């Protein structure tokens, strides 16, 4: 049995759910998490955790708040020396066999200072560590995203990138691609059939969502705004893991942002997606662009573009046919690679 310290960015559930899924695959080893925000919730599942500050992305009004994100990053970098000193003491006491980072800043730096092996497992490095044509109109957005990834989050020795799309890697000796890492809960469900569209648009306003969907012929099941009365064709539901997965597995399609976790789960169940990327969130835009390029759905750059939703819904059967028979489950292969690296 090995001891693994697993650093996780705690500003969104995507990082944490992927890390917990990987930890579940490595259950014969001792896993100790490190991070801030949502990471501390792992204690409820019986894991130990080390508290760390976050260099997270801050969202406001449905878009990345660049100035607030930069201010938070600068504040934590000014405290970096003290944070790293405390973390080194923790690692020296634990003496881990491996350090893993899912887009966490401090753990790979402390590992390097102590001469500990460190690997990265995330989706974000598909942005910087693979080769692809920049989507039209996104050069500045790509640059603004790539710089912090390279400067702040690329200190591991090796990168295991989880992704539903697979462009060529830039450095085959250090970078490997795997299929999506799925949470355990979706794997307990099987895909069904239905006519509704599941809607989860983090950061969008209720007004914008209702203006887009109200009065259309199709029925929409909407999460993220709490439970409400809804309209003739729109049902608003309260947050529920089981309820969400039930509605996902029986949906005809999904309308969501470009987050990799929900895209991967949707594709696992054969559900096409119409993507509305969060503003100035290049990783989400890139995901959505590949969704469209691969024929798995449509990229909808503005929530007001009703004509794109019209086209998407008309082509749901064709998009579903493109997804049929494909695998979007890379948990076992990625875990086997980690075992080989121990």
Could you say what each language-model-derived stretch is?
Residues 66-98, 105-106:
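Conserved nucleotide-sugar donor-binding subdomain of glycosyltransferases
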Residues 129-204, 225-226:
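A nucleotide-sugar donor-handling region in carbohydrate enzymes
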Residues 150-161, 165-168, 296-342:
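Leloir-type glycosyltransferase catalytic cores
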Residues 98-102, 120, 247-286:
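A donor-sugar binding/catalytic signature common to diverse glycosyltransferases
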Residues 6-10, 29-79:
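Conserved nucleotide-sugar phosphate-binding/catalytic loop shared by glycosyltransferases and other
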Residues 267-315:
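Catalytic binding pocket for nucleotide-activated donors in carbohydrate/polymer assembly enzymes
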Residues 181-253:
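Donor-nucleotide binding loops and adjacent catalytic segments primarily
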Residues 6-20:
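A short, glycine/small-residue-rich beta-strand->loop->alpha-helix junction that serves as a flexible
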